[in-house]
């Protein structure tokens, strides 16, 4: 009987130690993931800085402001329009490849980033008209337009 109690005590000690080790490792992983989640944009910003993307703003005649990132030299124009809950910076992961063949303009649609935040402009027709103005007055050349999610609806 004494041998069983000793064995049970040893097993409990091992189980307790294992539990504490797993708890510490789990907390460490949780802290790491929380940090990554709170600093997710830093990777995008480093990529944007490395590429030399220039952030600009243009004020339209109607007073609306379009914020955008521009990258590239003498190449055909490509306009990137993001979807909901995003910004032009979200294209940073594909910009290196796109920059090989395109002069990139990635805009913040209204209500996002540094573009106008007014309820009256959150309509596809207004966005569409203002993007046409942007192409005609800022890009000033034939432009391929690509949109993601809601940005694709705007592009259409």
Predicted features, each with a name:
Residues 64, 85-87, 152:
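Short beta->alpha connector loops
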């Amino acid at each position: 009987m004494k041998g069983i109690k000793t064995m049970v005590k040893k097993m409990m000690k091992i189980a307790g130690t294992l539990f504490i080790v797993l708890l510490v490792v789990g907390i460490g992983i949780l802290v790491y993931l929380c940090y990554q989640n709170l600093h997710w944009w830093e990777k995008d910003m480093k990529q944007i800085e490395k590429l030399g993307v220039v952030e600009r703003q243009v004020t339209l005649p109607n007073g609306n402001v379009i914020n955008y990132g521009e990258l590239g030299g003498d190449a055909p124009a490509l306009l990137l329009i993001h979807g909901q809950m995003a910004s032009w910076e979200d294209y940073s992961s594909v910009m290196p490849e796109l920059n090989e063949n395109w002069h990139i303009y990635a805009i913040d649609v209204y209500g996002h980033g540094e573009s106008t935040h007014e309820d009256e402009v959150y309509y596809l027709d207004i966005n569409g008209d203002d993007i046409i103005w942007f192409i005609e007055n800022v890009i000033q050349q034939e432009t391929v337009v690509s949109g993601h999610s809601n940005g694709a609806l705007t592009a259409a």
